[in-house]
């Protein structure tokens, strides 16, 4: 139900073999390490994104090489809406190019339930504006 299955191809005992790496519980955290250009996104991340979309999960994707992963996620979501009971929405927040970004207001009063939420939001904003207070 939750597992992610990564296809593999490896050379062993003088012949090529196909297999699978099964990540049975992706909630326990996953880390993908490798040098630039080693195929981390192609071999692992893309499969995670696609399989989780097919299973109807929501995702928060940090796309360092925007729009690479965003394009894959968006197109796969368009082609596989059957995993969702409610039609999902796709949003992009792009700090490098705000013209390509959706807008949101994290301090809008509708998002605050009590004075503690307002205090914590103001405190976080002030710490980010003046790093000497940290």
Where are the predicted features?
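Switch/coupling segment of Walker-type NTPase motor domains
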Residues: 3-134
């Amino acid at each position: 139900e939750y597992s992610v299955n990564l296809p593999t191809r490896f050379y062993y005992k003088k012949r090529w073999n196909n297999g699978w790496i099964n990540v049975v519980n992706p909630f326990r955290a996953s880390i993908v390490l490798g040098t630039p250009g080693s195929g981390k996104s192609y071999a692992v991340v893309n499969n995670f994104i696609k399989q989780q979309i097919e299973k109807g999960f929501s995702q928060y994707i940090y796309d360092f090489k925007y729009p690479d992963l965003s394009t894959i996620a968006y197109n796969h979501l368009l082609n596989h809406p059957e995993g969702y009971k409610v039609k999902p929405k796709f949003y992009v927040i792009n700090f490098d190019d705000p013209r390509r970004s959706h807008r949101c207001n994290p301090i809008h009063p509708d998002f605050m339930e009590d004075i503690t939420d307002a205090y914590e939001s103001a405190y976080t904003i002030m710490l980010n504006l003046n790093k000497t207070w940290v």
